[in-house]
């Protein structure tokens, strides 16, 4: 079976969904911009050699409808002979895009793929057109469709206090701000055109969503967002609403060698699991364990972890049950996470994988894991190995 390698990985800055930098930029343009960027950064690859494009997106309606992957590829002027498909596994969509492309390469159905994802939550809100089947109430709790309440459930089950959540949320903003100031994100962000507060067109090269003035005290003043009477989850300890895209160039190891392209990482193992929809945020735990089993590795072998921070109340139980609380500041979300950067649904899987690979390089880590929870009770994980 062919080994799958990551040749390059990029993302746009994360724009604030409400009146933010990308308020006049469409999802297809964010995606096409990254497709063009990957090709311009890797000139040894002829675009005609791309076998397929896999692009994650959750709300496939309006500008994100009618196969946004193909629309973006056409905008990017990728040859019409290159096919493209849009992938939806809710929050794990662009990581699923990576898995689908990797499997195609492993079995010889492809040699070169572009993968990525996009979500413009300002233009296409996550509740746009949602219409759950009423019969689901017979098989799952009604709250399973309300992500904030699933986080509240996990907090109660795992004794995660409001104070712990606020502390973790403040950490996310502080670390993301430090990563911005130190230039750590420069290796992954492709400057992207947007509009400033006055409507002037400019190129953004920083994440707009980070709040550097966030403190535990300022978070403590916020009211519960989902359970007003007994809740502990607030807007401040939840992932921000943001717009963005992410992308990777992946190929077989043999094709990368023949093109003379540097290899940044290999895919060691992949996994997707299901779990109780009422505690959907717990999915990273069984997904990570299964991926590590397939990789023949243990938790102790992993140098860096990236967990998507849907909620602090969701992330902390996962960190706790993976035995990582004592190593939090050495191994987990070292540049912050979705609480600070936002969680543009279809973008996030490739985004956290991109951040992970950059951290593995800067920290000289051999192995890393990127993992996410998924609405309605799933988890997804990928084990990466430095080349």
Swiss-Prot record:
Known EC number: 2.3.1.16
Keyword check for Lipid metabolism: yes
Primary gene name: fadA
Name assigned to this protein: 3-ketoacyl-CoA thiolase
A GO BP annotation: fatty acid beta-oxidation
Reactions this protein catalyses: an acyl-CoA + acetyl-CoA = a 3-oxoacyl-CoA + CoA
InterPro entries: FadA, Thiolase, Thiolase-like, Thiolase-like_sf_Thiolase, Thiolase_acyl_enz_int_AS, Thiolase_AS, Thiolase_C, Thiolase_CS
Oligomer status and interactors: Heterotetramer of two alpha chains (FadB) and two beta chains (FadA).
Similarity field: Belongs to the thiolase-like superfamily. Thiolase family.
GO MF term (any one): acetyl-CoA C-acyltransferase activity
Disulphide connectivity of cysteines: none
Transmembrane segments: none
Function text: Catalyzes the final step of fatty acid oxidation in which acetyl-CoA is released and the CoA ester of a fatty acid two carbons shorter is formed.
Gene3D superfamilies: 3.40.47.10
Enzyme class: transferase
Pathway connected to this protein: Lipid metabolism; fatty acid beta-oxidation
